[in-house]
Amino acid sequence: MLDSAKRLRRAWKRAHLRVREIRMIVKGLVSTDHPIDAHIIPMRRCNLACAYCNEYDDFSKPVPLDKMYQRLDHLAALGTAIVTISGGEPLLHPELDSIIARVRRHGMIAGMITNGYLLTADRIKRLNRAWLDHLQISIDNVMPDEVSKKSLKVLDKKLQLLGEHANFHVNINSVVGGGIHNPKDALAIGKRALELGFTSTVGIIHDGGGQLQPLRDEEREVYAAMRSMEKSSYARINYFQDNIAHGRENHWRCRAG
């Protein structure tokens, strides 16, 4: 059980983050002269090898901290609102906490996407001290299989640790498409996320060739059910996925003109 001091601390951080998110959304609507969300990869190496993923290797070294600082400073100079740290697996970078702290020092929202395998109580507390804003874990199935080891069975203890120790917002993203064998697993994952006090989203995953395909009937039903569970925030501005799910064309417009 969370003590009252921790609940108050989380509530304060949640309210403060919400104000910053609203400010970012308003700024993005008023002006198109700056990036909204920049993804940055400090570590391409990953500790897993999911069959559908082509965004990792097993040999790359961490990007040096001075180069990461240069890139983050430049993003700040451009007026970037959000920096999402991904990979590979960002928790493998030995200076990750300093990278997160640099993002926050510039007033940008600091998010991270991780597979969650390397989370411990101490690691979560270090992320708190670095002032991480958002953490997302993508869980692909209930039981691990040859496509993905990012399963609820393996990661549920990590989720419980996050529920106990994290002061930052946690979102659990489940997926359909891309060779995932049991689409209904996404519903079980989403319900578990809500039980633990997290938010839940669903994504359409690409196949091994990097291509997004329209969803099958069962996948569309699960996708619709999951979308109804999502809460409104800037991270849910993803209506383009509805078109992908139904095989409809998206009409993109570049914010830069």
How should these model regions be labeled?
Residues 1, 63, 109, 129-134, ...:
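Radical SAM enzyme [4Fe-4S]-AdoMet core and its adjacent flexible, acidic
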Residues 2-3, 7-134:
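Conserved alpha-helical substructure of the radical SAM core
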Residues 49, 256-257:
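Cysteine-cluster motifs in flexible loop/terminal segments that predominantly coordinate metals
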